């Protein structure tokens, strides 16, 4: 049971080419007041997460770390619910350091739900269009 909810290296986008692939070929975009989610379907066996927190957007290191920690934790809990395997890159927007953890979780939760709906909707459309 613990392995199901772990956040191993298999669930992380690690190399620059994989990040570039998501940025260039993003099939889904989910906007939140303080986040932008880019996602694309992948052939990898698992959904994977990449987090990009630029110093330009969030100045203080402890705030960048807090955002990354909350995004990873939220992904870890929602990842088993995805209908298909997707690569997701999460990018915070300016002003994110002023909101509380509860508000961050709420925005992340809403974004994951929307992403799950988009992925399920897309996976239903693709097989019928190939026949």
Swiss-Prot record:
Q: Which GO terms describe its molecular function?
A: 3'-tRNA processing endoribonuclease activity; ribonuclease P activity; tRNA binding
**Where would one find coiled-coil regions in this protein?**
none
Pfam families membership? Ribonuclease_P
Source organism per UniProt: Acinetobacter baumannii (strain SDF)
User: What EC numbers are recorded for this enzyme?
Assistant: 3.1.26.5
The answer on whether this UniProt entry bears the keyword Isomerase reads no
Biological role stated in the UniProt entry: RNaseP catalyzes the removal of the 5'-leader sequence from pre-tRNA to produce the mature 5'-terminus. It can also cleave other RNA substrates such as 4.5S RNA. The protein component plays an auxiliary but essential role in vivo by binding to the 5'-leader sequence and broadening the substrate specificity of the ribozyme.
Recorded name of the encoding gene: rnpA
The protein's UniProt keywords, in alphabetical order, are: Endonuclease, Hydrolase, Nuclease, RNA-binding, tRNA processing
List the protein's name: Ribonuclease P protein component
Entry-linked SUPFAM superfamilies: Ribosomal protein S5 domain 2-like
Question: Could you say which protein family the record assigns here?
Answer: Belongs to the RnpA family.
């Amino acid at each position: 049971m613990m392995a199901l909810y772990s956040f191993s290296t298999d669930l992380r986008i690690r190399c620059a080419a994989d990040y570039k692939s998501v940025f260039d070929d993003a099939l889904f975009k989910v906007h939140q007041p303080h986040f932008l989610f880019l996602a694309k379907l992948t052939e990898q066996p698992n959904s994977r997460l990449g987090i990009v927190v630029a110093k330009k957007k969030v100045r203080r290191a402890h705030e960048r770390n807090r955002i990354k920690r909350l995004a990873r934790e939220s992904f870890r809990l929602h990842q088993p619910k995805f209908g298909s395997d997707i690569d997701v890159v999460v990018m915070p927007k300016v002003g994110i350091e002023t909101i509380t953890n509860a508000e961050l979780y709420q925005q992340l939760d809403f974004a994951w739900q929307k992403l799950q709906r988009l992925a399920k909707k897309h996976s239903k459309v693709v097989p019928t269009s190939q026949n």
